[in-house]
């Protein structure tokens, strides 16, 4: 893996991450393909939205269809028909989300499979083995996602466990030519975030992620940790903010120097009839859209906006038609990718601050009427 920093405008960064299956232009947004598919779309449709890289879910793919199946295809790319780069998470967040169904020890995490109830044991070494079979371009270390809220003592214990697991992940990754990213933990405590980052950089990784945010904390806490942590991350490595977020979150994070993002928000909201536009959000369930002949966004060039009205999308949503979820997903992902493209161009032109101001002003236009 190679990271090239092309231009910096303030703290905002424009770069390229060169990976085994292609280049990723940053700032970049990764659509989430939990089970090896971005929900409701084909790989061609996902690429047509402007996506360069996808995220796959190690935990779920390990449980189903399993490594024996994916291994027959030489990895996830051929199995799912996507020839671009793939990042896989380590399974740590999914195990954390099981709550009382899992038991964490120094060695790893024991839990019951949510599919069939089988006893499973996931360790840093096993996570690295799984991700090697998946042949993902970017592998994430196995970590513990610090819960929110957490006392300083609990957050520190969790962070230190993640650091020990990070070292084990690095050792187990030896022999895998793909990139390995470390994950900064530490809850809502700046000093713990600093300690985590220092420990990870001492171990040494190809890129660094900010984990443990967007887990229920107030937005101001998320932004506080983001503003504190990002500037201290290595300048010559990609910076990845995990599981975030709204369009506003993405612009704010890029302003602090984040390069990569993933989030289920554009796809999940699309299936729930919640659409993002440059003028604000549209909720298709609202009756005001029943006879609206306009597209979602008159300036959007996605397939949905070029061919269908708000009235038709409202009808599909109210009728529960699968086509509605597909068209909505195409639009939301296209919107996110166009937002990333706009930020890349603004950084190149040295006008990111003006872009961010125009973005915020535009997004407020529909707040009262959507």
Swiss-Prot record:
Positions that bind Zn(2+): 300, 302, 305, 331
Source organism superkingdom: Bacteria
Keywords: Glycosyltransferase, Metal-binding, Queuosine biosynthesis, Transferase, tRNA processing, Zinc
Pfam family, one: TGT
Cofactor(s) the record lists: Zn(2+)
Catalytic activity: 7-aminomethyl-7-carbaguanine + guanosine(34) in tRNA = 7-aminomethyl-7-carbaguanosine(34) in tRNA + guanine
Region: RNA binding, residue numbers: 243-249, 267-271
Pathway per the UniProt entry: tRNA modification; tRNA-queuosine biosynthesis
Broad EC category: transferase
EC number(s) stated in the UniProt entry for this protein: 2.4.2.29
UniProt remark on cofactor binding: Binds 1 zinc ion per subunit.
Annotated GO biological process: queuosine biosynthetic process; tRNA wobble guanine modification; tRNA-guanine transglycosylation
GO cellular component, one term: cytosol
Active site as annotated: 89 (proton acceptor), 262 (nucleophile)
Amino-acid positions noted as binding substrate in the UniProt annotation, renumbered to this chain: 89-93, 143, 185, 212
Family to which the UniProt record says this protein belongs: Belongs to the queuine tRNA-ribosyltransferase family.
PANTHER family, alphabetized: QUEUINE TRNA-RIBOSYLTRANSFERASE
Record function comment: Catalyzes the base-exchange of a guanine (G) residue with the queuine precursor 7-aminomethyl-7-deazaguanine (PreQ1) at position 34 (anticodon wobble position) in tRNAs with GU(N) anticodons (tRNA-Asp, -Asn, -His and -Tyr). Catalysis occurs through a double-displacement mechanism. The nucleophile active site attacks the C1' of nucleotide 34 to detach the guanine base from the RNA, forming a covalent enzyme-RNA intermediate. The proton acceptor active site deprotonates the incoming PreQ1, allowing a nucleophilic attack on the C1' of the ribose to form the product.
Alphabetized NCBIfam families for the sequence: Q_tRNA_tgt, tgt_general
Subunit structure: Homodimer. Within each dimer, one monomer is responsible for RNA recognition and catalysis, while the other monomer binds to the replacement base PreQ1.
Protein name from the UniProt record: Queuine tRNA-ribosyltransferase
Organism from which the protein derives: Methylobacillus flagellatus (strain ATCC 51484 / DSM 6875 / VKM B-1610 / KT)
